[in-house]
């Protein structure tokens, strides 16, 4: 595995430069790639949270390239956090960055987000058919509206959606989660004994995502 610290700009008029880490598998020519979106910065979310680090390690071992990055205003990324108002543009910048690289298969780009990152990632994904696959980990059904953008006339649903949530998730509403899964035609996995923060379940979740995308 190779690791490269990278920088790119958010997909917006402002010059917001984002920091990221691109991890590449060894011996794979133009691998598919996954954009990893971190939880809310108010709760300490960044590209360095253990779950995203583990997901990157496992996905790379399965032949994927992985781009972790910090949303605007987090770490060395410029700008200020907007609570979700503009972070979708950050995912767009990550997508464009990967699309322009010659060593990555731009026809097979996926998104995986945890908590706040799941909300941002899905909002970006339904804006167009740019990604065929998305994984939503612990989508916070309480406090975040996952449905208003699905009802938009120009919404395009990803062809392959995986949802992973803990049975004891403090920010979950099971009825809403099941409705979201149904609307997206998703494969829903509920982990017994796991809460929203998924401590101790990092590798299990990473393997679920990697196996689903095999």
Regions found by a protein language model. Name each.
Residues 156-158, 162-165, 169:
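Short beta-strand/loop motif that positions the catalytic acidic residue
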Residues 39-40, 136-144, 166:
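Active-site nucleophile loop of the alpha/beta-hydrolase fold
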Residues 16-26, 30-104:
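Serine-hydrolase catalytic machinery in alpha/beta-hydrolase-like enzymes
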Residues 182-197:
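Catalytic histidine neighborhood in serine/cysteine hydrolases
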Residues 113-121:
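Gly/Ala-rich beta-loop-alpha elbow adjacent to hydrolase catalytic centers
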Residues 110-113, 137:
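Short beta-strand immediately N-terminal to the catalytic nucleophile in serine-hydrolase-like folds
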Residues 194-206:
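Catalytic histidine-centered segment of alpha/beta-hydrolase-like enzymes
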Residues 143, 167-172, 196-197:
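Acidic catalytic loop of the alpha/beta-hydrolase fold
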């Amino acid at each position: 595995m190779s690791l490269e610290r990278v920088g790119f700009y958010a997909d917006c008029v402002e010059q917001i430069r984002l920091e990221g880490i691109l991890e590449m598998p060894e011996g794979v020519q133009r691998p598919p790639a996954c954009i990893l979106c971190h939880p809310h910065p108010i709760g300490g979310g960044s590209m360095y949270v253990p779950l995203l680090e583990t997901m990157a390690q496992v996905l790379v071992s399965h032949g994927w390239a992985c781009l972790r990055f910090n949303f605007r205003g987090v770490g060395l990324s410029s700008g200020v956090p907007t609570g979700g108002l503009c972070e979708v543009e950050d995912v767009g910048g990550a997508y464009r960055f990967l699309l322009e690289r010659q060593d990555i298969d731009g026809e097979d780009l996926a998104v995986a987000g945890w908590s706040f990152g799941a909300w941002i990632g899905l909002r970006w994904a339904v804006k167009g058919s740019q990604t065929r696959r998305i994984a939503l980990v612990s989508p916070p059904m309480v406090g975040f509206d996952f449905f208003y953008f699905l009802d938009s006339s120009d919404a395009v649903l990803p062809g392959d959606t995986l949802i992973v949530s803990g049975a004891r998730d403090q920010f979950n509403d099971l009825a809403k989660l099941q409705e979201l899964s149904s609307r997206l035609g998703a494969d829903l996995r509920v982990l017994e004994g796991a809460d929203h923060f998924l401590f101790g379940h990092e590798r299990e979740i990473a393997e679920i995502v990697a196996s689903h995308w095999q």
